[in-house]
A protein has these predicted regions:
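Residue-level signature of outer-membrane beta-barrel architecture
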Residues: 2-6, 19, 66-70, 116-120, ...
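Transmembrane beta-barrel strands of outer-membrane/channel proteins
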Residues: 15-23, 30, 66, 77-83, ...
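Internal, hydrophobic cores of structured domains that mediate oligomerization or house catalytic pockets
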Residues: 1-25
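Repeated loop/turn-to-beta-strand initiation elements of outer-membrane beta-barrel proteins
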Residues: 10, 72-75, 122-128
Length: 176
């Protein structure tokens, strides 16, 4: 949600309030392993599920938004900040049948977006955009699940989590 406090034909400046959630996940199948400084090595069969990992970051945020127009060109920028971000992850080790879950609260979240475009017509616009986000590295709690034995162990202040990411894109926008 954006409230514009400066608005002119060629520029706008406003304050933002919102909520953002970002998720990442990946898995490892097959491959080679090396533990204990190379003393224990081996191979997993191709296609065998080994590890699955998921991260979720959520944050209510405050921010600034701006737009500047020069003839058919425009530049749009946003900056978001939150001291209340929360990170969660799940680390699944399939072969050992164990799961680690971590939760970190009160992380700092920063995000910046810049979008540069050219208006081909009043409805059509081509643009390029870059966004960058950072969630600070902070300490949180971890829970260990031995799924085969049914054991659960909770460990306070034993997990650390952070995230940096960026995207670069280009597109065509059509307004109805």
């Amino acid at each position: 949600m954006t409230g514009w406090f400066l608005k002119d034909e060629n520029y706008q400046l406003g304050a933002m309030l919102g909520y953002q959630e970002t998720r990442f996940s990946w898995g490892a199948t097959g491959g080679h392993y090396s533990y204990n400084n190379g003393n224990i090595t081996g191979d997993f069969p191709r296609g065998q599920k080994v590890i699955g990992y998921q991260q979720k970051f959520s944050a209510p945020y405050l921010g600034l938004a701006g737009k500047y127009i020069y003839r058919d060109f425009d530049i749009i920028a946003q900056f978001k900040y939150s001291p209340w971000a929360e990170g969660k992850d799940t680390d699944q080790h399939y072969l050992r049948d164990i799961t680690f879950k971590e939760k970190v609260i009160n992380q700092k979240y920063y995000s910046a977006v810049i979008n540069v475009g050219y208006n081909i017509t009043p409805q059509a616009r081509v643009f390029t955009e870059m966004s960058w986000s950072r969630t600070s590295n902070d300490v949180g709690d971890s829970t260990y699940y031995d799924n085969a034995e049914g054991e659960v162990e909770k460990m306070k202040d034993s997990a650390g989590m952070q995230n940096y990411n960026y995207t670069i894109g280009a597109g065509i926008q059509y307004r109805f």
